[in-house]
């Protein structure tokens, strides 16, 4: 474990690690112990009780956006390519973009593809997969409905998923945001995660929830969703 600085230790000392804070108090405390001089991102970590065969994965558009606009790349041909440009995609193409990405170009944040392009896009698996950007029907990034896909991405639609240890890590705000807006994003995100509870799971679905800022310690949050 890396050595923590004096300011982190001071902030850590103000957090009762045995206490479950309600979300309002957790947000207040998070801002009170903030010591970084930049606008920190606020993250949530949800520990789930999952079996090995369970998958928790989906996308969400939070009610209060805080991230910079995403650079949207669309793989499409012909009329579909024209549609993508009309709907505001940042980059649109087919083989030209595939070759460009193979050469090391990476100036994009999210990738969408029409179904007919996936055979060719699949050649980028080692590159896009490593960045978590391979188009997938489950995340609504393999589709012929480019209008809805692009519009929702422009509104901030973002993927979340549980890792192999059953932990979901997700950014849901900025420290400069109004407390109520941070709370709204928190509640919307947890609500969406709860909807992904596996139908055959017995017992509690959520084991624990923590929030933290970029540089700050974790704060355990009380929750009623199980």
Curated annotation (Swiss-Prot):
Q: Key word Transmembrane present in the record?
A: no
**From its record, what is one biological process in GO terms?**
regulation of translation
Record key words, sorted: Repressor, Ribonucleoprotein, Ribosomal protein, RNA-binding, rRNA-binding, Translation regulation, tRNA-binding
**What is a single cellular component term in the Gene Ontology annotation?**
large ribosomal subunit
Give the matching PROSITE patterns: RIBOSOMAL_L1
Domain of life of the organism encoding this protein: Bacteria
**InterPro entries per the UniProt record, alphabetical:** Ribosom_uL1_bac-type, Ribosomal_uL1, Ribosomal_uL1-like, Ribosomal_uL1/biogenesis, Ribosomal_uL1_3-a/b-sand, Ribosomal_uL1_CS
CDD domains given in the database record: Ribosomal_L1
Which Gene Ontology molecular function entries are recorded, alphabetically?
A: rRNA binding; structural constituent of ribosome; tRNA binding
Q: Please name the SUPFAM superfamilies in this protein's record.
A: Ribosomal protein L1
Task: Tell me the Gene3D superfamilies matching this sequence.
Answer: 3.30.190.20, 3.40.50.790
Which is an annotated Pfam family here?
A: Ribosomal_L1
> What does the similarity note say?
Belongs to the universal ribosomal protein uL1 family.
Protein function: Binds directly to 23S rRNA. The L1 stalk is quite mobile in the ribosome, and is involved in E site tRNA release. Protein L1 is also a translational repressor protein, it controls the translation of the L11 operon by binding to its mRNA.
Subunit structure and binding partners:
Part of the 50S ribosomal subunit.
- The name this protein goes by in its record: Large ribosomal subunit protein uL1
Q: What is the source species?
A: Borreliella burgdorferi (strain ZS7)
Q: Give the lineage.
A: Bacteria, Pseudomonadati, Spirochaetota, Spirochaetia, Spirochaetales
